[in-house]
Amino acid sequence: KGLYEIGTSFHVFNKSNQGITPTVYYQFLHDGESNQGSAFMPSFTGTAYYSEEEDFEKISFDDVKGENNEFKSKVINNGWIGIIQRYFVSSWILPSKQDRKFFSEEIDNSNIYRSGVLTPLEIMPKEDISINVNLYSGPQLKQDLEKAAPGMELTVDYGMLHIIASPLFSVLSGIQKFVNDWGVSIILLT
């Protein structure tokens, strides 16, 4: 309860007498629907990624639709990629300095989208390796996101009310830590 980071581990043994160069895929699928928010306060649903070089970026599913994919892929050696929607985020968090290629695309004009990361490996003959990657999948709780990976807290989107909402949420979180109940925290804040 209360833990949203899942450690994943893959074990690969190259039994051959030749080196191999497999690629590991980590991806999410989304149906492209975003029936969340209102016309006055819309919420973003789509791909998001973070890297030290480019900071935090959001990519709407419309931007990766069909042949006009404006994102396609991005090759870097740090950061994370995920899918965000109102109140929730899921992201793959790879170890730093590990080469990776982020991607986001529509699958066969189906309004189904995949976003993820490819990681090339080099495995020598008779070598056996372990690959450890974290998956964060849970609510956009700023304190948990800050612990998960650099830039994850940027997935919290208060929209145009950010200047008011951000400090208010910090106070609300402080109350929640004390009373351990979000409902009671909201009542006490208001």
PLM regions and their residue ranges:
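Interfacial loop/helix-cap signal at membrane boundaries in integral membrane proteins
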Residues: Y136-S185
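Soluble non-transmembrane domains of integral membrane proteins
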Residues: K1-T155
